[in-house]
Amino acid sequence: MFGKAGLGGLMKQAQQMQENMKKAQAKLAETEIEGEAGNGLVKITMTCAHEVRKIDISPDLIQEAADDKEMLEDLILAALKSARGKAEETANKTMGAFTQGLPPGVGDFFR
């Protein structure tokens, strides 16, 4: 099926792909995105590796939420889900470029 030269070339391509994927993963680990809820009253900044870097709650919301802890919790959760969704989307776009055209599941081999 593959000659020695063909198999060697294929292995070299696979190694290069793995190196490029590692670089992309490292970049994603530093790429920050922001999710928000309540028209920006709660903002969460996280990396595409899901490391939360910052939570910003509007002082106005803190005053309003003094009597409504559940509302504040819901807004924080919504902002976190928003940030996580954006992080996943960004990561999938970036990593998808490496696995485009490969059979399903083969891309997981390189992660």
Swiss-Prot record:
Domain of life: Bacteria
Record's subunit section: Homodimer.
Function summary: Binds to DNA and alters its conformation. May be involved in regulation of gene expression, nucleoid organization and DNA protection.
Family: Belongs to the YbaB/EbfC family.
Protein name: Nucleoid-associated protein NMB1444
Single annotated GO MF: DNA binding
Any single GO CC term annotated in Swiss-Prot or TrEMBL for this entry: bacterial nucleoid
Signal peptide: none
Matches recorded under Gene3D superfamilies: Nucleoid-associated protein YbaB-like domain
Chief location bin: cytoplasm
Pfam families per UniProt: YbaB_DNA_bd (PF02575)
Key words, A-Z: Cytoplasm, DNA-binding
Protein localization: Cytoplasm, Nucleoid
Protein biosynthesis found in the keyword field: no
